[in-house]
Amino acid sequence: MTITNEQVERINELARKKKAEGLSEAELEEQALLRRAYLDSVKANFRSQVETIKVIDEKTGEDVTPDKLKEIQRKNGMRD
């Protein structure tokens, strides 16, 4: 799930309002939902990036990618 620029702007708007004057209960709930969506998006993007990494030993040139990561990559069709 990706978060839109409008959602990020709304998160920032609510943060500014909270600091300046406080938020209503509805706004607090909206802020919590938007923040959760934002964090879920960041986590998904980070996981996607990590799952495509291949670790190579500089000295030997061997693939030293952890087995757990290799298994995930195989499940996603990125390894033999």
UniProtKB/Swiss-Prot annotation:
Transmembrane segments: none annotated. The keyword Cytoplasm applies. Pfam families: DUF896. InterPro entries: DUF896. It is found in: Cytoplasm. One of its GO terms (cellular component) is cytoplasm. It comes from the Bacteria. Keywords: Cytoplasm. Coiled coil: none annotated. Belongs to the UPF0291 family. PANTHER family: UPF0291 PROTEIN CBO2609/CLC_2481, UPF0291 PROTEIN YNZC. This is UPF0291 protein llmg_1475. It comes from Lactococcus lactis subsp. cremoris (strain MG1363).
